[in-house]
Swiss-Prot record:
UniProt record, GO biological process: RNA catabolic process
Any single Pfam family the record assigns to this protein: Helicase_C
Organism placement in taxonomy: Bacteria, Pseudomonadati, Pseudomonadota, Gammaproteobacteria, Lysobacterales
Gene: rhlB
Cross-referenced PANTHER family: ATP-DEPENDENT RNA HELICASE RHLB, ATP-DEPENDENT RNA HELICASE RHLE-RELATED
Name of the protein this chain belongs to: ATP-dependent RNA helicase RhlB
Length: 573
């Protein structure tokens, strides 16, 4: 970014709708930034744009002005229904979508345009009702919008006349490109639809997407002397893993009161670092995928108001968030991707302000440094880790920010936030169920979600399961300790007890409701008894005395019937 972030070109010099000019002026926007000065002359007449500029240079306002002006001065498509959206703005992350929506409402609320914010992690039905009522502009993340378009037909994009893709390179990183292509194919063809694409880097894959789905886009690049903002003072330390927290505390104690962001690489270290800072008296907020969406929004809002001193985050907050007055950005962990380094330090020194970017290159992540320096085309100055820096200075009492005491979340500690997050995640998993459920929510047997401790659904012990019988083994029901087998005659014994290969090819005996089936052998006993089965020594089977009380008459066990049926099928073949 140049030392002069604003140009001499004013918004009033363009042929904008009068209400839009008034809204911009009331919001404090009068002169254009370089990317706005390049974009608006192409986008306002209806041309497609593929724009590249650093974060914090005003890309959001550039496309919002183009979108709103088109909707105000041009009629809608002829086949549009009142509830169909006319414009779609896609962002890769929830935080960026929320930021865009906030900026849009800031100066577009009085223009008569209806905005809808659509993203995951919040009330599904509430967003669906808002879309069904009809909106002019949808600001969304791809995942939730795909669900409304594809699954439930809540919204139709056939009358969407302008589409914006913000942070297109990040769309690729997060795997959203298939979703983007799906949505673009549901809109009018590119000759009718205007498309604006913005990215911090116009890589080959981003340009491929642009030329595939855009109508002869004009490539606009804001030239800079360096990849990183010129007003960011960068420096790097080489601490050991054990020194990182102590060094962070020492540096923070030397910048009391400055709004600070600390970036780490993993969600686990977000909690660990935030807990350490909180124990030393800092008011800390956290942004990571483990924190529920509503809590993330609340913490971000408190940080923007100055009620929180430090925000510890993963790369979920590295792009698109515009937070005024961030003076220090700490890379507690060097990022794996060099582009992420640029986006992280881009949270400070926005729109001509100054800021400091301080990085720690420990033995775990120091291998990323050469790629980062090659990407930004400069060497990052190295500072020594001294004993003085490892000694935190005494903290001065912090003044209470207006409205802080009445904030509902002001008493939330880092431990409370993550404990509630874990409880919420466990409740969500329980609600989804470990296995499938039958009618009424009862668990089905055999679905894979049952208990593994031998207890039934009512908590009582189950009887042991029988081992499946292998072909050729004796039926357990015919063991000597069971009810004896009654043999009709000695001459018939071999036919009844012979091995499977020696049986006569006849229909097996079966019972239906306790009555013999036609063709079955007569039963000597007056009461129904289990059908005879082949013992281990067929030629020596004789009736044996009863050693235990006879079981009540009834059908053979399920396993016995299955085994006999299988043997009959084998012998019949």
């Amino acid at each position: 970014m140049s030392d002069k972030p604003l140009t001499d070109l004013t918004f009033s010099s363009f042929d904008l709708h009068p209400a839009l000019v008034a809204g911009l002026e009331s919001a404090g926007f009068t002169r254009c930034t370089p990317i706005q000065a390049l974009t608006l002359p192409v986008a306002l007449p209806g041309g497609d744009v593929a724009g590249q500029a650093q974060t914090g240079t005003g890309k959001t306002l550039a496309f919002l002005v183009a979108v709103m002006n088109r909707l105000l001065i041009r009629p809608a498509l002829a086949d549009r229904k009142p509830e169909d959206p006319r414009a779609l703005i896609l962002a890769p992350t929830r935080e960026l979508a929320i930021q865009i929506h906030k900026d849009a409402v800031k100066f577009g609320a009085d223009l008569g345009l209806r905005f809808a914010l659509v993203y995951g992690g919040v009330d599904y039905d509430k967003q669906r009702e808002l879309l069904q009522q009809g909106v002019d502009v949808i600001i969304a993340t791809p995942g939730r919008l795909i669900d409304y378009v594809k699954q439930h037909k809540v919204v139709s994009l056939h009358a969407c006349e302008i589409c914006v893709l913000d942070e297109a390179d990040r769309m690729f990183d997060l795997g959203f490109i298939k979703d983007i292509r799906f949505l673009l194919r549901r809109m009018p063809e590119r000759g009718t639809r205007q498309t604006l694409l913005f990215s911090a880097t116009l890589s080959h894959r981003v340009l491929e997407l642009a030329y595939e789905h855009m109508n002869e886009p004009e490539k606009l690049v804001v030239e800079t002397e360096t990849i990183t903002a010129a007003r960011v003072r960068q420096r790097i330390y080489f601490p050991s893993d054990e020194e990182k927290q102590t060094l962070l505390l020492g540096l923070l104690s030397r910048s009391e009161g400055a709004r600070t962001m600390v970036f780490v690489n993993t969600k686990a270290f977000v909690e660990r670092v935030a807990r350490t800072l909180e124990r030393h008296g800092y008011r800390v907020g956290v942004l990571s995928g483990d924190v529920p969406q509503k809590k993330r929004e609340s913490l971000l809002n408190r940080f923007q108001k100055g009620q929180l001193e430090i925000l510890v985050a993963t790369d979920v907050a590295a792009r698109g968030l515009h937070i005024d007055g961030v003076k220090y950005v700490y890379n507690y962990d060097l990022p794996f991707d060099a582009e992420d380094y640029v986006h992280r330090i881009g949270r400070t020194a926005r729109l001509g302000e100054e800021g400091d970017a301080i990085s720690f290159a420990c033995e775990r992540y120091a291998m990323s440094l050469p790629d980062i320096e090659a990407y930004i085309e400069q060497k990052i100055p190295v500072e020594p880790v001294t004993t003085e820096l490892l000694t935190p200075l005494p903290r001065t009492p912090r003044a209470t920010v207006e409205g802080e005491e009445v904030d509902d979340d002001a008493g939330d500690s880092v431990g409370t936030i993550f404990r509630e997050a874990r409880e919420q995640r466990a409740a969500d998993e329980a609600r989804r169920g470990g296995g499938r459920s039958g009618p009424g929510g009862a668990s089905r047997s055999g679905s894979g979600g049952g208990r593994r401790d031998g207890a039934g659904a009512d908590g009582k012990p189950r009887p042991p399961r029988r081992k499946p019988r292998v072909e050729g083994e004796a039926d357990p029901a015919a063991a000597p300790s069971e009810t004896p087998v009654v043999v009709a005659a000695a001459a018939e014994t071999p036919a009844v007890t012979a091995a499977e290969g020696e049986r006569a090819p006849r229909k097996r005996r079966r019972r239906r409701n306790g009555r013999p089936v036609e063709g079955a052998e007569p039963v000597v006993a007056s009461t129904p008894v289990p059908a005879p089965a082949a013992p281990r020594k067929p030629t020596q089977v004789v009736a044996k005395p009863v050693r235990a009380a006879a079981k009540p008459s009834g059908s053979p066990s399920l396993l016995s019937r299955i085994g006999r049926r299988l043997r009959s099928l084998v012998s019949g073949s």
